[in-house]
Amino acid sequence: MANLFTATAPFLSLSKPFTKTASYHQCYASSSNPPEPESSSPPPPPPPPQPLASQQKRKKNVETTDWVASSLTRRFGIGAGLAWAGFLAFGVISEQIKTRIEVSQEVANTRDVEEEKEIVLPNGIRYYDQRVGGGATPRAGDLVVIDLKGQVQGTGQVFVDTFGTKDKKKMKPLALVVGSKPYSKGLCEGIDYVLRSMKAGGKRRVIVPPSLGFGVDGAELESGLQIPPNASLEYIVEIDRVSIAPA
């Protein structure tokens, strides 16, 4: 009997080493991948909300600088307004991508005319250059910004004036797409025709015959002013900016 108990003792003792081996592997696995220590620094605080006044100021700045798109939308529909916005977004407006050298060259090439000379075109338009521009020449489809004063020749009735005077608040310059109709705000076919032979920075006095003005019927403008039938029109037009349409 004693031998039997003695023989079984080593067999029974195998469970203890097995347990130690398992514990050893567990400890090894645990020690090879120790837990990362928790960071003692607190998370950064969230950014403070933007003040309402600052948001309103930013919105106001966008609205005040986008009057050209608004003007085009009112005159030619949302397509023209979106076209202008697209030009702004992709940076193809010539005034925005010009280098300082190009701007200085444009200014250097712009010159006042000492003595006005009458130029008579085959279609009956007469004009007198007061300043020869040194910038780009607008073509059909280009966006142009102009200052304009128009009056009925003979009566002197002023029906549009963006140059402004001491007694009258200056209107905003007019924006138009060259070659697009209908015309508004005192513009007519004769002015659209003359713009194509001018350059940015140029200023010209133009006499438009009735056939290229408001014709035999005359016109009633948005301001309520009446242009009489068969009226010849006298304009002063100055090109402030030419934004060449992308090819």
Curated annotation (Swiss-Prot):
Enzyme nomenclature, EC number: 5.2.1.8
What residue range does the UniProt record give for the transit peptide?
1-79
Known catalytic reactions: [protein]-peptidylproline (omega=180) = [protein]-peptidylproline (omega=0)
Keywords attached to this entry? Chloroplast, Isomerase, Plastid, Rotamase, Thylakoid, Transit peptide
Q: Does the keyword Transmembrane apply?
A: no
Q: Which InterPro entries match?
A: Chloro_FKBP-type_PPIase, PPIase_dom_sf, PPIase_FKBP_dom
Q: Which domain of life is it from?
A: Eukaryota
Q: Per the record, what is one GO cellular component? A: nucleus
Q: What are the residue boundaries of the PPIase FKBP-type domain, all occurrences included?
A: 141-243
Family as reported in the entry's similarity comment? Belongs to the FKBP-type PPIase family.
The task this protein performs is described as: PPIases accelerate the folding of proteins. It catalyzes the cis-trans isomerization of proline imidic peptide bonds in oligopeptides.
PANTHER family in alphabetical order: PEPTIDYL-PROLYL CIS-TRANS ISOMERASE FKBP17-2, CHLOROPLASTIC
Protein's recorded name = Peptidyl-prolyl cis-trans isomerase FKBP17-2, chloroplastic
Question: What is this protein's gene name?
Answer: FKBP17-2
